Regions:
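Hydrophobic alpha-helical membrane-insertion segments
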Residues: 37-43, 160-175
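Hydrophobic transmembrane alpha-helical segments in integral membrane proteins
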Residues: 1-15
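Membrane-interface helix-boundary motifs at transmembrane edges
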Residues: 23-36, 97-105, 150-159
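Hydrophobic cores of alpha-helical transmembrane segments in multi-pass inner/ER membrane proteins
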Residues: 12-20, 74-90, 140-147, 205-221
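A generic, lipid-embedded transmembrane alpha helix
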Residues: 38-58
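Membrane-interfacial, low-structure loops and terminal tails that flank and connect transmembrane helices
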Residues: 94-111, 228-247
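Short aromatic-rich membrane-water interface segments that cap or initiate transmembrane helices
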Residues: 2-5, 62-79, 193-208
Length: 247
């Protein structure tokens, strides 16, 4: 059995395994994965907002207990960010193509950046309410997902299906954690301050986090970079149009 101090590190590193597999198996998504993963890793620095109110995991060098920060959160966020952004496209064989400039000027997109920033606006507004900080985080990502669908209806399917896929993906990882380290959830999560509802040993809030993270993050790259998704074969045909022909 893994010592408690290294369980969080082991679990965070486990998320890098599918990341590496997808990165090398599907090179067309490498740019997206790198950019989204690096951006998501920054959110690992928000860990002091959740320790010890939401959970209090033993960490390398006891960093979380001493400062609230930890290295594991950076690894974890990096791993889930890249996979969450491309999981739908990998499984449905979709690629990204840029949106034409005239389409960007349509009235539908006038709140483009506000929609993208909506989670960053929502979270601090809700954080100071008398509830556990995990709930404003969940609500903020849900608001971001709704804003994405309103601003970019073409991403609706990717948002909904991507959210469901990521929740299932995260569920498998968490179930492995609970199976390999029984009692870890009760030891680390602040169950009395949250719902206390466990589904196969997994806190309900973790599944809500996974669902809303997947909903927002599955389309964040396309939304931010002004891309849409198309079937891979269509993307290939569009690229071939620009290849020189033999005389």
């Amino acid at each position: 059995m893994i010592p408690h101090q290294y369980i969080w590190l082991t679990w965070a590193l486990a998320f890098l395994i599918p990341w590496v597999v997808i990165f090398y198996a599907f090179p067309q998504y490498q740019k997206t994965m790198w950019q989204v993963s690096l951006a998501t890793a920054v959110f690992g620095l928000t860990e002091p907002l959740f320790v010890p109110e939401y959970w209090n995991p033993p960490t390398l060098f006891n960093l979380a207990q001493l400062s609230g920060f930890d290295l594991e959160s950076l690894i974890f966020c990096f791993g889930i960010g890249g996979v969450g952004s491309v999981l739908y496209s990998v499984l449905t064989r979709r690629n990204n193509v840029p949106i034409p400039w005239p389409e960007k000027r349509l009235p539908l997109h006038r709140h483009h950046y506000k929609a993208l920033a909506s989670p960053l606006i929502t979270f601090p507004l809700l954080y100071f309410l008398p509830w556990n900080p995990i709930y404003p985080a969940i609500a903020a990502m849900a608001v971001g997902a709704i804003a994405t669908i309103v601003c970019r209806p073409d991403l609706k399917t990717k948002t909904w299906v991507g959210g469901a896929l990521f929740m299932g993906y995260y569920f498998v990882f968490f179930l492995a954690l609970e199976t390999s380290s029984p009692g870890y959830v009760q030891h680390v999560w602040n169950l009395p301050d949250i719902s206390g509802i466990l589904l196969l040993g997994i806190p309900l809030e973790e599944l809500l986090f996974a669902a809303t993270f997947g909903l927002y993050w599955s389309s964040v790259y396309e939304h931010l970079m002004w891309h849409r998704i198309v079937p891979a074969q269509i993307h290939g045909k569009q690229k071939n149009r620009h290849l020189p022909t033999k005389l």
